[in-house]
Swiss-Prot record:
Catalyzes the 2-thiolation of uridine at the wobble position (U34) of tRNA, leading to the formation of s(2)U34. Pfam families: tRNA_Me_trans, tRNA_Me_trans_C, tRNA_Me_trans_M. The active site is at 111 (nucleophile), 210 (cysteine persulfide intermediate). GO terms for molecular function: ATP binding; tRNA binding; tRNA-uridine 2-sulfurtransferase activity. Residues 158-160 are annotated as: Interaction with tRNA. InterPro entries: MnmA-like, MnmA-like_C, MnmA-like_central, MnmA-like_central_sf, Rossmann-like_a/b/a_fold. This is tRNA-specific 2-thiouridylase MnmA. It is found in: Cytoplasm. Keywords: ATP-binding, Cytoplasm, Disulfide bond, Nucleotide-binding, RNA-binding, Transferase, tRNA processing, tRNA-binding. The keyword RNA-binding applies. GO terms for biological process: tRNA wobble position uridine thiolation. The keyword RNA-binding applies.
Amino acid sequence: MTETPQRPRRLRVLAAMSGGVDSAVAAARAAEAGHDVTGVHLALSANPQSFRTGARGCCTIEDSRDARRAADVIGIPFYVWDLAERFREDVVEDFIAEYEAGRTPNPCLRCNEKIKFAALLDKALALGFDAVCTGHYAQVIVREDGTRELHRASDMAKDQSYVLGVLDDRQLAHALFPLGDTVTTKDEIRAEAERRGLAVAKKPDSHDICFIADGDTQGFLANRLGKAEGDIVDESGSVVGSHEGAYGFTIGQRKGLRIGTPAPDGKPRYVLDISPVDNTVTVGPAAALDVTALTAIKPRWCGAAPTGPGTYTAQLRAHGGETQVTAELVDGELQVTFAEPVRGVAPGQAVVLYDGTRVVGSATIATTTRTATAVA
């Protein structure tokens, strides 16, 4: 069966333009491919002046202006759509609630699922567009029978398929990723932008969480949830330190622990468990982080759901590596067993399954199994 990247026919494309170089080049490539492209910048902050500190953050008035200038150079219509309230409800408040519950969310996945390929896509389809184009590094491969598959980018070093693993068949059918099927370095993308006359060619990349411009996640959460002093305990339950809010930690964390009593072996301690119920954080040795299996909920499939147990590779973080697993859907939940123990797996994170380069689907980690103990 033959396969081709993306789609050959001319489409009405809505290009999401963040004001950065990747989305600008993606829009330019879509237009160059012959599609009827319109640019749109998403206003996601009620206070856009506070969304950037240096190279951090995004979604500012400056970004909107950069996106408009890029659209003018490309020669496409351009609009700004205000989705700030939807973003606050579906991404920011979800982020806060997940941390408050002791879990570790990924707001980029949630934004793709709820904003770019839901709120934006729905509005685009209602206006007669065929597809939404973004600057993500991933590939949509169309099989001979018309089936669309999400694959890793040709350049594995820049692959972003993990944060797109939440897309279902309907969303994937209207997704366009012009950057994903070529092996190019970021310097080459910037050089292409410069050749095209795009002023964003030298604009720094944004980093970290877009709505936490200074990168201080704990400070952001403390401002929203307030300080709540509690104990840091070791595996025996002995108090070894204190904290100002259990919500400010994540499984596997080492830095920022206020521990007054050193470990008997003198080795570093890591966060093993977070209990919002009694506001305690449990710490222990690195070896205690070894996870052999996990259960994940709310699975979303890029194609048909697996009908039985299978062998896959799994990715657990946006910039994490692959690991071999067996996985099976049991009573609507994904049961995953690792071929070798892995560390730093936190409830709330997404597990994305791959068959080679193809994204099979994703689910949200609910519990993990370490040796003989399940952690929720």
